[in-house]
Amino acid sequence: LIGTQTPQLEEIFYDLTHKLDVDLGGSGSNLRTPAACLGQSRCEYACYNTQDACYQLTMDYQDELHRPAFPYKFKFKFDGCPNGCVAAMARSDFAVVGTWKDDIKIDQEAVKAYVAGEFAPNAGAHAGRDWGKFDIEAEVINLCPSKCMKWDGSRLFINNAECVRCMHCINTMPRALHIGDERGASILCGAKAPVVD
């Protein structure tokens, strides 16, 4: 086909589709290839099997990858937890995000160890610089978006009914806090519309 021009391509496409019964697909994929985080294969925070969900949906809608039936550039993405490693909520039309229903598990002794400086916050991820002494009020309590946490100097309290499951406290103190046991997923449909002037 090198060197052919558009009028010749139209004839070739017609012959392929009408005489040779070849499926050429659409002019572009309306359903983008689904994406998922590594999920339970590598992450302790994954609340469901992201890889399996992504595989099953890909197999169910495989034909839509090149025979457009979805709205323009429809995207499925699967995040195993609210950390959002594949940015499902921000970058897809159909987001499946792992979450939990029950309470955040608290190890009060580990919380005290963080406050005492025995454990590095953020699992030591920012250990290259001297950030000063860990301040649970400034680094965890005050940064909670729903203000559902309280530290009385010896015990951490979480109002789980108000918790929005953002993972900030868990990421900051992973030895002290952990996701609950009643795990599942939230499904969010719809995307931001493009800004058109």
PLM regions and their residue ranges:
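Small-residue-enriched alpha-helical segments and adjacent helix-cap loops
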Residues: 2-124, 134, 157-164
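A glycine-rich, aromatic-flanked flexible loop/lid motif
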Residues: 26-29, 140-143, 191-193
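Short connector loops/turns at beta-strand edges and beta->alpha or beta->beta junctions
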Residues: 101, 149, 192-195
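Short Fe-S-cluster ligation motifs
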Residues: 107-138, 171-179, 195-197
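Iron-sulfur cluster-binding cysteine motifs and their immediate structural context
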Residues: 138-158, 164-186
